[in-house]
Amino acid sequence: MKVRPSVKPICEKCKVIRRRGKVMVICENPKHKQRQG
């Protein structure tokens, strides 16, 4: 899980979602998981 100020999809399988007011990227590649901090 990477915590960064701006989250962007890295590959075509990355999805940008909102969970509890936080913007997150989920992907089948675990390295692409991101959360907005």
UniProtKB/Swiss-Prot annotation:
Alphabetized UniProt keyword annotations: Ribonucleoprotein, Ribosomal protein
Return one Gene Ontology term, BP aspect: translation
Annotated GO molecular function terms are: structural constituent of ribosome
Q: Does the keyword Ligase apply?
A: no
Q: Which GO terms describe its cellular component?
A: cytoplasm; ribonucleoprotein complex; ribosome
Query: What domain of life does the native source organism fall in?
Result: Bacteria
Protein family (similarity comment): Belongs to the bacterial ribosomal protein bL36 family.
Gene (name only): rpmJ
**Any Pfam family matching the protein:** Ribosomal_L36
Q: What is this protein called?
A: Large ribosomal subunit protein bL36
Q: Is Signal among this UniProt entry's keywords?
A: no
